[in-house]
């Protein structure tokens, strides 16, 4: 294992247990590149949010300067050959090995710019556009590392990122409100007469959260279709990640507003069980007639 892979693996183990668990199922070469890519994505997120690995976001001083530095470092990694820190060296290696369009990593940076600008999200499409920039494009890049070139399959990979981010938004609504952020569609909040305040969601706010989780289900269903086009071990890993993350939404549904009194996550024992179920999901995805149409779903921009 190279020093760069080792450094990236250590960062991911600390920062995302769910990803670290799912990544173990991948073939070694692909696993190394996905870990390096994820390490850069996680580092970029932490820079903007002022987070230590895996901690809650905090309000940060001079977010625009952080964004400008992140953008400059990313471009330096993609365009040059000079020395860069390990997360950016990891991005450089993976992007060149898998022929990423420069627009892909920069789309992620644009998502962080939306945070810095405190963008207002009035509609579900607004939220999905943001979700593409901070998560959907990560799914696209991961799929490319796994050998995917076809746009329809990359769209399914993007759908998984969208589903993950909608689940994130539902889980983190209270924490986000503490630092002045809200990613729930404003028109939904207005329709429900809901406000984002207090230690647990009000009944009105909880109905909006459930509505967002319903939207996530459409993208999880679409993403499952793409499993059939991945190498078997990659498909198993992604199916497991889907199950592990979707379980967060199921906990919110089961626990009601009171679920927010503690960190909502999936236990280690549950993750192990979901790894096995993910294998069955892969098998089902390869059966005739397993496809689900994407008609009506938000679609990512297709860069040349």
Swiss-Prot record:
<dbReference type="GO" id="GO:0004311">
    <property type="term" value="F:geranylgeranyl diphosphate synthase activity"/>
</dbReference>
<dbReference type="GO" id="GO:0016117">
    <property type="term" value="P:carotenoid biosynthetic process"/>
</dbReference>
<dbReference type="InterPro" id="IPR044843">
    <property type="entry name" value="Trans_IPPS_bact-type"/>
</dbReference>
<comment type="pathway">
    <text>Carotenoid biosynthesis; astaxanthin biosynthesis.</text>
</comment>
<dbReference type="InterPro" id="IPR008949">
    <property type="entry name" value="Isoprenoid_synthase_dom_sf"/>
</dbReference>
<keyword id="KW-0808">Transferase</keyword>
<dbReference type="GO" id="GO:0046872">
    <property type="term" value="F:metal ion binding"/>
</dbReference>
<protein>
    <recommendedName>
        <fullName>15-cis-phytoene synthase</fullName>
        <ecNumber>2.5.1.32</ecNumber>
    </recommendedName>
</protein>
<comment type="pathway">
    <text>Carotenoid biosynthesis; phytoene biosynthesis.</text>
</comment>
<comment type="similarity">
    <text>Belongs to the phytoene/squalene synthase family.</text>
</comment>
<keyword id="KW-0464">Manganese</keyword>
<comment type="function">
    <text>Involved in the biosynthesis of carotenoids for the production of astaxanthin. Catalyzes the condensation of two molecules of geranylgeranyl diphosphate (GGPP) to give prephytoene diphosphate (PPPP) and the subsequent rearrangement of the cyclopropylcarbinyl intermediate to yield 15-cis phytoene.</text>
</comment>
<dbReference type="InterPro" id="IPR019845">
    <property type="entry name" value="Squalene/phytoene_synthase_CS"/>
</dbReference>
<dbReference type="Pfam" id="PF00494">
    <property type="entry name" value="SQS_PSY"/>
</dbReference>
<dbReference type="InterPro" id="IPR002060">
    <property type="entry name" value="Squ/phyt_synthse"/>
</dbReference>
<keyword id="KW-0479">Metal-binding</keyword>
<keyword id="KW-0460">Magnesium</keyword>
<dbReference type="GO" id="GO:0051996">
    <property type="term" value="F:squalene synthase [NAD(P)H] activity"/>
</dbReference>
<dbReference type="GO" id="GO:0046905">
    <property type="term" value="F:15-cis-phytoene synthase activity"/>
</dbReference>
<keyword id="KW-0125">Carotenoid biosynthesis</keyword>
<dbReference type="InterPro" id="IPR033904">
    <property type="entry name" value="Trans_IPPS_HH"/>
</dbReference>
